[in-house]
């Protein structure tokens, strides 16, 4: 029997823009209330909140879903805990958790831009060379935040003995590789392994886990980053955020999924990525071949002429 998001309650991080905003719209249109956790909201996200106002005196329902926002830095564990508490206070229960916020190895947290130091004073990196412990922001956001939010979600569901759905935003980068963004690829490889590892929860305690794995998608993740946007044309990015949102809804509502499923999504359709001996993805379909070619040229020039400064 098909599942339904109608009348459910969700947390979506990164819902202020891009894929996660498109998915937030999709959930609301299907009668699912959403609490968005993000650093900020794009104008279209602010308009969405106005369309689905929250009246604390009236519980949300399938006929009257609500949209709320809590400013959240997902790299902060206390802020993730506060986001979860806010959802518990606003909703009767939490049914769906989507750790969707992510960054695509920006110049300020990149393997090829090591942290600023006495011997590397001009680095654009915001990562701290003297951090105790040391860490990279791209891993904090892309990998550690979904793991921590998953702990909070599973604690909510198991303490109440209720079912739940954990839907993580992965990437085709979780099973391919590229020299230009090794931290990003590492984060998505780790994320897919994490999701698969939780797969037994579905048949043990009725907690469904899955990841969507898009190729390049026409979102601010590309367009707002000058290091990315000048290496790929909008014509090559065939998939829209709405395409991916449709596939994410399928992951939630199709009962055959949820046991650690990794669902690849491109403009041409979807496929379940098997855990072993998976056929390679079509990089052209994924829309990243032009980007990889451009970033490889940049990397080769930098590493051969300048080396790596730390």
Per-segment meaning from a language model:
Residues 171:
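Residue(s) in the substrate-gating loop at a strand-loop-helix junction
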